[in-house]
Amino acid sequence: MGAGPGLLIQPDWLVADARNPPRAGWGVRVVNGLIDTVGPNSDLSDRYPDDEAIPAPGRILMPGFVNSHVHMYGVLAHGIPTGSAPTGFWPFLEDFWWPQVEDRLDHEMITAATDWVCTEMLLSGTTTFLDILEAPASLPEALLAEKDIVDRRGLRGVLSFEATERSSPESGQMGLLENLAMIDACRDGGLTSGIMYTH
């Protein structure tokens, strides 16, 4: 039990983990940003009468969702006309995705997409994600542009650049360096981290 004032979050239902059933009338006590106590809402109110309480009738409290594979920049392709229907996956990549989306991305477009998708994730309950960016014309510091938005939104994000020689051998090397720079930029901790990603 933590000392000091806490915050009681009191929903109608608590889903704590997959091993236990949902619990009606249960909530949590938060102290210094961490869950300190889990139990029936009435018990929490009795045990911690001086804590601020947030009643949440009609609500469910549960851990955030995890999106383990996302390409946030892909949201920018919504509504771009293809001219004709792709005849397969490779024609889709070669005739549409690479020239119309990935090869045109710059920092401004990347940050707009990141902001948009982070907002959608938060609104849908996703709090943790792994993003793979592929935008050869945006190097260097494209991942740092993403990181700035993710940090401001308060999500836990793992950011990576798809290092590939699709555009050129030099682009592949720059992608590796981009990942290394992100890994180094996140060494001090925080909600954002980087990983090495190749394709």
Regions from the PLM with identified roles:
Residues 1-47, 60-61:
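N-terminal metal-binding scaffold of metallo-dependent hydrolase/deaminase domains
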Residues 138-199:
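Metal-coordinating catalytic core of metallo-dependent amide/deamination hydrolases
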Residues 76-110, 167-168:
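Active-site gating loops and adjacent loop-to-helix segments of metal-dependent hydrolytic enzymes
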